[in-house]
From Swiss-Prot:
Its EC number is 3.4.24.-. It is found in: Cell inner membrane. It is a multi-pass membrane protein. Its main location: membrane. The keyword Kinase does not apply. This is Protease HtpX homolog. It comes from the Bacteria.
Amino acid sequence: MFNWVKTAMLMAAITALFIVIGGMIGGSRGMTIALLFALGMNFFSYWFSDKMVLRMYNAQEVDENTAPQFYRMVRELATRANLPMPRVYLINEDAPNAFATGRNPEHAAVAATTGILRVLSEREMRGVMAHELAHVKHRDILISTITATMAGAISALANFAMFFGGRDENGRPANPIAGIAVALLAPIAGALIQMAISRAREFEADRGGAQISGDPQSLATALDKIHRYAAGIPFQAAEAHPATAQMMIMNPLHGGGLQNLFSTHPATEERIARLMEMARTGRFE
Protein backbone atom coordinates (compact mmCIF):
# COMPACT_ATOMS: atom_id res chain seq x y z
CA MET A 1 0.00 0.00 0.00
CA PHE A 2 2.82 2.41 0.89
CA ASN A 3 4.42 2.01 -2.54
CA TRP A 4 1.07 2.81 -4.20
CA VAL A 5 0.82 6.04 -2.18
CA LYS A 6 4.43 6.87 -2.98
CA THR A 7 3.83 6.27 -6.69
CA ALA A 8 0.73 8.50 -6.71
CA MET A 9 2.63 11.27 -4.91
CA LEU A 10 5.50 10.99 -7.39
CA MET A 11 3.12 11.25 -10.35
CA ALA A 12 1.41 14.29 -8.82
CA ALA A 13 4.76 15.99 -8.14
CA ILE A 14 6.00 15.38 -11.67
CA THR A 15 2.70 16.65 -13.11
CA ALA A 16 3.12 19.86 -11.11
CA LEU A 17 6.70 20.18 -12.33
CA PHE A 18 5.59 19.77 -15.94
CA ILE A 19 3.00 22.53 -15.47
CA VAL A 20 5.65 24.88 -14.06
CA ILE A 21 7.94 24.10 -16.98
CA GLY A 22 5.09 24.70 -19.42
CA GLY A 23 4.46 28.10 -17.86
CA MET A 24 8.13 28.99 -18.19
CA ILE A 25 8.22 28.02 -21.83
CA GLY A 26 4.83 29.22 -23.08
CA GLY A 27 2.83 31.02 -20.42
CA SER A 28 -0.74 29.89 -19.72
CA ARG A 29 -1.00 28.09 -23.04
CA GLY A 30 2.20 26.25 -22.24
CA MET A 31 0.80 25.26 -18.85
CA THR A 32 -2.29 23.76 -20.49
CA ILE A 33 -0.22 21.83 -23.00
CA ALA A 34 2.12 20.66 -20.23
CA LEU A 35 -0.84 19.45 -18.13
CA LEU A 36 -2.19 17.40 -21.02
CA PHE A 37 1.30 16.07 -21.74
CA ALA A 38 1.82 15.13 -18.08
CA LEU A 39 -1.52 13.32 -17.88
CA GLY A 40 -0.61 11.40 -21.01
CA MET A 41 2.82 10.59 -19.57
CA ASN A 42 1.25 9.33 -16.33
CA PHE A 43 -1.06 7.02 -18.28
CA PHE A 44 1.77 5.84 -20.51
CA SER A 45 4.16 5.33 -17.59
CA TYR A 46 1.71 3.17 -15.64
CA TRP A 47 0.78 0.90 -18.52
CA PHE A 48 3.82 0.90 -20.80
CA SER A 49 6.94 2.08 -18.93
CA ASP A 50 8.21 -1.49 -18.46
CA LYS A 51 8.00 -2.14 -22.21
CA MET A 52 9.77 1.15 -22.87
CA VAL A 53 12.64 0.30 -20.52
CA LEU A 54 13.05 -3.18 -22.00
CA ARG A 55 13.12 -1.62 -25.47
CA MET A 56 15.78 0.88 -24.35
CA TYR A 57 18.01 -2.08 -23.53
CA ASN A 58 17.02 -4.08 -26.62
CA ALA A 59 16.07 -6.90 -24.25
CA GLN A 60 15.03 -10.16 -25.91
CA GLU A 61 12.44 -12.38 -24.26
CA VAL A 62 13.54 -15.97 -23.71
CA ASP A 63 11.78 -19.16 -22.70
CA GLU A 64 12.56 -22.72 -21.70
CA ASN A 65 13.64 -23.55 -25.24
CA THR A 66 15.95 -20.58 -25.88
CA ALA A 67 17.53 -20.26 -22.41
CA PRO A 68 16.55 -23.42 -20.53
CA GLN A 69 18.89 -23.24 -17.53
CA PHE A 70 18.29 -19.55 -16.84
CA TYR A 71 14.52 -19.81 -17.37
CA ARG A 72 14.18 -22.83 -15.07
CA MET A 73 16.22 -21.03 -12.40
CA VAL A 74 13.84 -18.06 -12.44
CA ARG A 75 10.81 -20.35 -12.38
CA GLU A 76 12.11 -22.29 -9.38
CA LEU A 77 12.89 -19.10 -7.46
CA ALA A 78 9.50 -17.58 -8.34
CA THR A 79 7.84 -20.71 -6.96
CA ARG A 80 9.87 -20.44 -3.75
CA ALA A 81 8.81 -16.79 -3.44
CA ASN A 82 5.12 -17.60 -4.12
CA LEU A 83 5.17 -15.28 -7.13
CA PRO A 84 3.66 -15.66 -10.60
CA MET A 85 6.21 -16.58 -13.24
CA PRO A 86 7.64 -13.31 -14.63
CA ARG A 87 8.63 -12.78 -18.24
CA VAL A 88 12.35 -13.44 -18.66
CA TYR A 89 14.68 -11.35 -20.83
CA LEU A 90 18.33 -11.34 -21.88
CA ILE A 91 20.30 -8.21 -22.82
CA ASN A 92 23.26 -8.61 -25.16
CA GLU A 93 25.75 -6.56 -23.11
CA ASP A 94 29.14 -7.57 -21.71
CA ALA A 95 28.66 -5.52 -18.53
CA PRO A 96 27.32 -7.78 -15.75
CA ASN A 97 23.99 -6.51 -14.42
CA ALA A 98 20.31 -7.34 -13.95
CA PHE A 99 17.01 -5.65 -13.13
CA ALA A 100 13.28 -6.22 -12.64
CA THR A 101 10.43 -4.17 -14.08
CA GLY A 102 6.65 -4.18 -14.45
CA ARG A 103 3.62 -2.65 -12.75
CA ASN A 104 2.85 -5.51 -10.33
CA PRO A 105 3.84 -9.14 -9.62
CA GLU A 106 1.27 -10.35 -12.16
CA HIS A 107 2.86 -8.24 -14.91
CA ALA A 108 6.54 -8.45 -13.97
CA ALA A 109 9.67 -9.08 -15.98
CA VAL A 110 13.26 -9.84 -15.01
CA ALA A 111 16.23 -9.15 -17.24
CA ALA A 112 19.91 -10.05 -17.11
CA THR A 113 22.84 -9.26 -19.35
CA THR A 114 24.71 -11.96 -21.20
CA GLY A 115 27.78 -10.66 -19.39
CA ILE A 116 26.44 -11.52 -15.95
CA LEU A 117 25.65 -15.07 -17.07
CA ARG A 118 29.26 -15.49 -18.17
CA VAL A 119 30.81 -13.98 -15.04
CA LEU A 120 28.77 -15.59 -12.27
CA SER A 121 28.42 -19.19 -11.20
CA GLU A 122 24.96 -20.78 -11.21
CA ARG A 123 24.76 -20.40 -7.43
CA GLU A 124 25.63 -16.70 -7.66
CA MET A 125 23.10 -16.18 -10.46
CA ARG A 126 20.45 -17.67 -8.18
CA GLY A 127 21.33 -15.06 -5.58
CA VAL A 128 21.04 -12.24 -8.12
CA MET A 129 17.70 -13.37 -9.54
CA ALA A 130 16.34 -13.93 -6.03
CA HIS A 131 17.25 -10.29 -5.32
CA GLU A 132 15.32 -9.16 -8.41
CA LEU A 133 12.31 -11.27 -7.45
CA ALA A 134 12.42 -9.67 -4.00
CA HIS A 135 11.92 -6.31 -5.74
CA VAL A 136 8.87 -7.83 -7.45
CA LYS A 137 7.55 -9.24 -4.18
CA HIS A 138 8.04 -5.91 -2.39
CA ARG A 139 6.29 -4.10 -5.29
CA ASP A 140 9.27 -1.82 -5.87
CA ILE A 141 9.15 -2.32 -9.61
CA LEU A 142 6.30 0.07 -10.49
CA ILE A 143 7.76 3.15 -8.82
CA SER A 144 11.29 2.45 -10.06
CA THR A 145 10.15 2.00 -13.66
CA ILE A 146 7.85 5.04 -13.62
CA THR A 147 10.59 7.15 -12.04
CA ALA A 148 13.04 6.15 -14.75
CA THR A 149 10.71 7.03 -17.63
CA MET A 150 9.46 10.26 -16.04
CA ALA A 151 12.96 11.49 -15.23
CA GLY A 152 13.99 10.79 -18.80
CA ALA A 153 11.01 12.78 -20.08
CA ILE A 154 11.86 15.74 -17.83
CA SER A 155 15.46 15.73 -19.04
CA ALA A 156 14.27 15.67 -22.66
CA LEU A 157 11.90 18.56 -21.98
CA ALA A 158 14.72 20.52 -20.35
CA ASN A 159 16.90 20.02 -23.42
CA PHE A 160 14.04 21.13 -25.67
CA ALA A 161 13.53 24.28 -23.64
CA MET A 162 17.24 25.09 -23.60
CA PHE A 163 17.53 24.83 -27.37
CA PHE A 164 14.26 26.41 -28.43
CA GLY A 165 13.50 28.83 -25.61
CA GLY A 166 9.90 29.94 -25.37
CA ARG A 167 7.34 32.69 -25.63
CA ASP A 168 4.37 33.66 -23.52
CA GLU A 169 0.73 33.69 -24.65
CA ASN A 170 1.17 37.17 -26.19
CA GLY A 171 4.08 36.07 -28.33
CA ARG A 172 6.69 37.94 -26.28
CA PRO A 173 9.95 36.24 -25.30
CA ALA A 174 9.58 34.31 -22.08
CA ASN A 175 11.27 35.47 -18.88
CA PRO A 176 15.05 35.02 -19.39
CA ILE A 177 15.30 33.72 -15.83
CA ALA A 178 13.11 30.84 -16.97
CA GLY A 179 15.85 29.68 -19.30
CA ILE A 180 18.22 29.32 -16.37
CA ALA A 181 15.59 27.51 -14.33
CA VAL A 182 14.78 25.11 -17.15
CA ALA A 183 18.49 24.41 -17.63
CA LEU A 184 18.48 23.00 -14.11
CA LEU A 185 15.74 20.46 -14.83
CA ALA A 186 18.05 17.57 -15.63
CA PRO A 187 19.59 17.75 -12.13
CA ILE A 188 16.05 18.00 -10.74
CA ALA A 189 15.22 14.77 -12.56
CA GLY A 190 18.14 13.15 -10.77
CA ALA A 191 17.01 14.58 -7.46
CA LEU A 192 13.53 13.14 -8.00
CA ILE A 193 15.07 9.71 -8.33
CA GLN A 194 17.10 10.23 -5.17
CA MET A 195 13.93 11.13 -3.26
CA ALA A 196 11.75 8.40 -4.73
CA ILE A 197 14.18 5.51 -4.66
CA SER A 198 15.66 4.95 -1.23
CA ARG A 199 18.93 3.12 -0.69
CA ALA A 200 17.04 1.15 1.95
CA ARG A 201 15.15 -0.49 -0.91
CA GLU A 202 18.32 -2.26 -2.09
CA PHE A 203 19.11 -3.49 1.41
CA GLU A 204 15.56 -4.84 1.68
CA ALA A 205 15.86 -6.58 -1.68
CA ASP A 206 19.19 -8.10 -0.60
CA ARG A 207 17.54 -9.41 2.56
CA GLY A 208 14.45 -10.60 0.68
CA GLY A 209 16.57 -12.25 -1.98
CA ALA A 210 18.59 -14.07 0.68
CA GLN A 211 15.34 -15.36 2.16
CA ILE A 212 14.08 -16.55 -1.22
CA SER A 213 17.29 -18.35 -2.18
CA GLY A 214 18.21 -19.38 1.36
CA ASP A 215 21.81 -18.49 0.49
CA PRO A 216 22.92 -14.95 1.40
CA GLN A 217 26.58 -15.76 0.76
CA SER A 218 25.90 -16.44 -2.93
CA LEU A 219 24.49 -12.94 -3.37
CA ALA A 220 27.42 -11.46 -1.45
CA THR A 221 29.99 -13.10 -3.72
CA ALA A 222 27.91 -12.16 -6.77
CA LEU A 223 27.87 -8.49 -5.75
CA ASP A 224 31.63 -8.56 -5.24
CA LYS A 225 32.19 -10.02 -8.71
CA ILE A 226 29.74 -7.66 -10.40
CA HIS A 227 31.36 -4.68 -8.69
CA ARG A 228 34.85 -5.67 -9.82
CA TYR A 229 33.95 -6.64 -13.39
CA ALA A 230 31.50 -3.78 -14.02
CA ALA A 231 34.14 -1.17 -13.13
CA GLY A 232 36.06 -2.01 -16.29
CA ILE A 233 33.21 -2.74 -18.71
CA PRO A 234 31.02 0.12 -19.97
CA PHE A 235 27.27 -0.55 -20.07
CA GLN A 236 26.41 1.41 -23.20
CA ALA A 237 22.61 1.26 -22.90
CA ALA A 238 22.71 2.40 -19.28
CA GLU A 239 25.10 5.25 -20.10
CA ALA A 240 22.65 6.35 -22.80
CA HIS A 241 19.70 6.20 -20.36
CA PRO A 242 21.15 7.13 -16.94
CA ALA A 243 17.71 7.60 -15.36
CA THR A 244 17.29 3.81 -15.51
CA ALA A 245 20.46 3.15 -13.50
CA GLN A 246 18.54 2.90 -10.22
CA MET A 247 16.75 -0.21 -11.53
CA MET A 248 19.97 -2.24 -11.73
CA ILE A 249 21.34 -4.52 -9.03
CA MET A 250 24.61 -2.54 -9.30
CA ASN A 251 25.11 1.06 -10.41
CA PRO A 252 26.15 0.75 -14.09
CA LEU A 253 27.29 4.35 -14.60
CA HIS A 254 30.97 5.19 -14.92
CA GLY A 255 30.76 8.92 -15.69
CA GLY A 256 31.06 11.74 -13.19
CA GLY A 257 29.18 14.98 -12.79
CA LEU A 258 25.53 14.78 -13.80
CA GLN A 259 25.49 11.00 -13.98
CA ASN A 260 26.39 10.77 -10.30
CA LEU A 261 22.99 12.28 -9.53
CA PHE A 262 21.41 9.06 -10.75
CA SER A 263 23.42 6.87 -8.37
CA THR A 264 20.99 5.49 -5.82
CA HIS A 265 22.82 2.36 -4.70
CA PRO A 266 24.35 1.90 -1.26
CA ALA A 267 28.02 1.02 -0.95
CA THR A 268 28.73 -2.48 -2.24
CA GLU A 269 30.98 -3.17 0.74
CA GLU A 270 28.13 -2.48 3.16
CA ARG A 271 25.73 -4.68 1.22
CA ILE A 272 28.24 -7.53 1.25
CA ALA A 273 28.92 -7.10 4.97
CA ARG A 274 25.21 -7.31 5.79
CA LEU A 275 24.77 -10.42 3.67
CA MET A 276 27.79 -12.14 5.21
CA GLU A 277 26.38 -11.38 8.65
CA MET A 278 23.14 -13.06 7.59
CA ALA A 279 25.13 -16.08 6.40
CA ARG A 280 27.03 -16.21 9.69
CA THR A 281 24.01 -15.89 11.98
CA GLY A 282 21.29 -17.44 9.84
CA ARG A 283 19.07 -14.47 10.70
CA PHE A 284 17.51 -12.54 7.80
CA GLU A 285 16.84 -9.28 9.63
